[in-house]
């Protein structure tokens, strides 16, 4: 499976998360996963919540619509984003 899988219902992302970064940013592909840096620390679910907030803004979908399928307590995550309204510039060449 590649880092980004486009389906009729939406996008499935395989993510490598880098918490406690200096800024929120989609870095690119890292070992067949999409590397995303976020500023939140990996404590008490703060990194997951921040990641969902960041992706909801990037894809213009509600936070509650994004589904964390795998990796709640891990840096390696799999998310499903139903019917994104916008594809971030960093991801367009990867689709």
UniProtKB/Swiss-Prot annotation:
GO terms for cellular component: cytoplasm. It holds the Pfam family DUF167. SUPFAM superfamilies: YggU-like. It comes from the Bacteria. InterPro entries: DUF167 (IPR003746), YggU-like_sf (IPR036591). Belongs to the UPF0235 family. This is UPF0235 protein MS0322. It comes from Mannheimia succiniciproducens (strain KCTC 0769BP / MBEL55E). The lineage of its organism: Bacteria, Pseudomonadati, Pseudomonadota, Gammaproteobacteria, Pasteurellales.
């Amino acid at each position: 499976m590649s880092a980004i899988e486009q389906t009729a219902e939406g996008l499935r992302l395989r993510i490598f998360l880098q918490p406690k970064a200096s800024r929120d940013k989609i870095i690119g592909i890292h070992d067949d996963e999409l590397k995303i840096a976020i500023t939140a620390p990996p404590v008490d679910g703060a990194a997951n919540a921040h990641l969902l907030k960041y992706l909801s803004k990037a894809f213009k979908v509600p936070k509650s619509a994004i589904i964390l399928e795998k990796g709640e307590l891990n840096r390696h995550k799999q998310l499903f984003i139903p019917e994104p309204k916008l594809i971030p510039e960093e991801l367009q060449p990867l689709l």
